[in-house]
Curated annotation (Swiss-Prot):
UniProt-listed SUPFAM superfamilies: Anticodon-binding domain of a subclass of class I aminoacyl-tRNA synthetases, Nucleotidylyl transferase, ValRS/IleRS/LeuRS editing domain
PANTHER family recorded: ISOLEUCINE--TRNA LIGASE, CYTOPLASMIC (PTHR42780:SF1), SOLEUCYL-TRNA SYNTHETASE (PTHR42780)
Known catalytic reactions: tRNA(Ile) + L-isoleucine + ATP = L-isoleucyl-tRNA(Ile) + AMP + diphosphate
Main localization category: cytoplasm
Keyword line: Aminoacyl-tRNA synthetase, ATP-binding, Cytoplasm, Ligase, Metal-binding, Nucleotide-binding, Protein biosynthesis, Zinc
Motif 'HIGH' region location, chain numbering: 53-63
One GO MF term: tRNA binding
Motif extent ('KMSKS' region): 654-658
Family note: Belongs to the class-I aminoacyl-tRNA synthetase family. IleS type 2 subfamily.
Organism from which the protein derives: Rickettsia bellii (strain OSU 85-389)
Top-level taxon of the source organism: Bacteria
Protein name (record): Isoleucine--tRNA ligase
CDD domains for the chain: Anticodon_Ia_Ile_ABEc, IleRS_core
Amino acid sequence: MTNTKYYPEVSSNADFATIEKEILKFWQDNNIFQKSIDIREGDAEFIFYDGPPFANGLPHYGHLLTGFIKDVYARYQTVRGKKVERRFGWDCHGLPAEMQSEKELGISGHLAITNFGIEKFNAHCRDSVMKYAGEWEQYVTRQARWVDFKNSYKTMDKNFMESVLWAFKELYNKGLLYESMRVMPYSWACETPLSNFETRLDNSYRERADKAVTVSFVLCHPVSKSTLDVIPWLDHGIQKTINNDSANCSMDPVDKPRYDTENFLGITANYKEYRILAWTTTTWTLPSNLALAVGSDIDYALVPKGDVCYIIAASSVSKYAKELELKGDEQFTIIKGSELQGLSYKPLFDYFKNHPNSFKIFAGDFVVEGDGTGVVHMAPGFGEDDQILCESKGIKLVCPVDNSGKFTKEIPDLEGLQVFDANDKIIIKLKEQGNWLKTEQYIHNYPHCWRTDTPLIYKAVPSWYVKVTEFKDRMVELNQQINWIPTHVKDNLFGKWLENARDWSISRNRFWGTPLPVWKSDDPKYPRIDVYGSIEELEKDFGVKITDLHRPFIDELTRANPDDPTGKSTMRRIEDVFDCWFESGSMPYGQAHYPFENKQWFEEHFPADFIVEYSAQTRGWFYTLMVLSTALFDRPPFLNCICHGVILDATGQKLSKRLNNYADPLELFDKYGSDALRVTMLSSNVVKGQELLIDKDGKMVFDTLRLFIKPIWNAYHFFTMYANADHIKGELNFTSENVLDVYILSKLKIAVEKIKESLDSFDTGTAYHAVSEFFEVLNNWYIRRSRARFWKSEKDADKQSAYNTLYTCLETMAIAMSSLVPLISEAIYLGLYCHPRKSGDPEKPECLDSRLCGNDNLSVHLCDYPDLSKFKINSELVDTMDTVLDICNHSLFIRSSENARVRQPLSSITIISKNNDKLKSFEDLIKDEINVKSVIYRDDLENYAVKKLSINFPLLGKRLPAKMKDIIAASKKNEWEVTSGSLIICNETLNSDEYKLILEPHSHIKGASSFAHNSSLLILDLELTPELIDEGIARDIVRFIQQARKNADFAITDRILIDINLPKITDIYGEFIKEQTLGKFAKDFIPDHISEIELDNHKLQLKIKKVN
């Protein structure tokens, strides 16, 4: 007989953080990550795109969540036999880097940067952008995520930037680019426009209180006979028909309107003036007003106040009752908005009073009733709708606000004032002029800069645009080729965004970014535009060697304008750089330096098989990838995409350093291990796009450790402890005929198959559930029911079969779940493969780093996924044993609810079912597990219980709201029937998810519970006889002795002496107690351990001693 211990000594109270660090070191020392790629050389590839983060900040829980998901599928596809390269990447350009540099340099704004020097500023950006790269690698490595940092790409690398230039020129050549002056979301804090989709990113909108003002505009429309035909409500005694020339309408900006009876609208004796009321939340745009808009079909009321008649949407009159001095019983003349079209009004201010074609009322389909007056003031330099409407009427925009959001000299009395700071001064001026009617506090969601958290403005700026609207229908078509998780993203969140896509502004008037490769003539008399798509083209035209594509080096490239015969004009680059989202969207080809290098590689690695980020990236990275992929290649950029949700604190607030509402992830890793955090995140609904609330103290992670990781480890600990004690080595074996072995091996195949199916469909939640469900059965059924096989002293075939089966379960599951819990799986796998030393002490296993040298499967992550063809499933046995397990679980529930402890034997259990014949072969098992003396079988279910209908009211109420009252009444009366498997109530057939049938025992029956999906009933006899009570005490003695053995730190194989003074029990049940505890009863020995216990209302001493 050998005394070899084949497995390491495993503690039941393992320090998982320490174990994980040992595994991480093992991976590093043995280059396991690279081996996992190398062994798949020549195999099919799984293409994975790793979205580039910024490295100028530390990783947060959102990054870790995304990283966990990426790692799961990369590892899973590897064990499925595919080669998975995982090249890391870094976003380097854009506002995050610039804002950080401005802060560190103590400067702010375009002028300050220019004075500081663009070269020095960009050099600082280059140095600081990778500030936390080392910390990123530490976090990513500690979370057990495998990525290739050594060959990482950076968007600031010359090769990447050149691919971006190529993409731009391709779009230009396809006619998909244009330059225009358009109103865009504008960050005055960053002095740059933002894309429309950037205002849709998470938390871009904040609740904000603004002063909303209502102002009056004086009508001064000249009237002719034809005008009266169109606007009959003006005909109240016209003094004179005059020439239809709105230019004669004039107004002093401070004084009252002046009227010339020979040239201006005659006003009846009833009204001195007509004033139309407009409401706005952007008071600062009023100095730039050039028009008003009304709704053609909206009703407008003529509301008199003294000798002035106000025009306002009829639905808004009541909101201005105080200001218009209404009593509540007035009747007003009502006109349609269409009757206001074409009227002129006097400018509020004289800043642009001579602006052509301005100061008229037009119809706009964007005008709606609700907030305000039903009249929208138009400032085409500061509103998208305003610009579109005004341009259609021949009104050119004005924009008297500079890049920093301050008024220019065009508004002399507000020059240099920040627009939001000008609101109060403008209101004062309106009051002085008599145009003010009302100011109110208006609380609304307003877009803010995603980098500076300052409120945006909408402002006309020159920019280059991608004509997304020209091919958005094609994007919608290509989107149908993508598998989205969750599925509703395809046609809702992402699909509807694509349907409503706008042209994309891709230029930014900033400094640190890939420069737009556009050169223009500096003389408009000889216009010319050159667009470059490669370094070679630049070097050819400018005759210099290009070593850096950044500003200011690229700005210094000039040449004579070839189209200027005088030779005096020069081609100069426009100052703009790319929107950094354009660079992110260029990642698939940028990382490969396509098309200048790796052309075949790119074509074989595009599109990606898989991509993942949080849901807001449907407006960000996913979107820009889609735009550029469609425009350049007419293909979707990826085939499978997970949109996960966001992580919030326990109260639902965003995780924030300022709020101090989350723990440093590294602290959690050191406390509970990263596998526990991985399971916590990826088993939740956050992977399905929902929110995950996580507490600062890590209780959720601890619960995962306790409820998910520990059961896995407990099974491994049990195996190694008993296998070492018996000096038995387990082997893979799928052919045992023992009924428990066949059952657990069948359940093993079901679990492994479920994990595979789940991960194939990108569903980690179901995969984790399959793991947890299997180990629940393995620990609490198979191991517990097989203890006698492990404990018996003879090493027969049955004992070896039990070890082989448990070994097979552990090794197979270690491989199957290796992507889900990579560190713990590795620890278990390595432990199972631990061989004895060839020399030295055979009792001690080899060290972690050396014991597997020369083994092909050096790591669980180098294995192939379990071959399901090796497994056989006995479906009938599984169904029956699952029912047995269901019976036992419900019996335990009854015991718990009736305060009948498990160790207390009961006389009988009655099983009332139509499938009793299959259960009878497991009668001894049921009796032993439930701790009853007999099993009674019956099939007359109707004598013991009745079926009740339970309706899913929220679900059914959506489908049949009108019938719910009748259905509820009928369900209470049991007026329903099941026909051909369908439930019918009130002549309606219910869907399976709209109801449940509950088996309800008759009220006089105690100790009863339904099982087998409410198809059967069991009843425990809870009456206790003296004999049953005594046997229960004997079983309690066994428990106390076992606990004493544990407290005394005895080995499981140690035999002991026992001294307890309870002869009434020990005389009858002595043999049972000795057998269960490896003990003998004795007196007068010196104990190794003494316990004070209470049994049968008596306090006793329990003494035990280990026998040498």
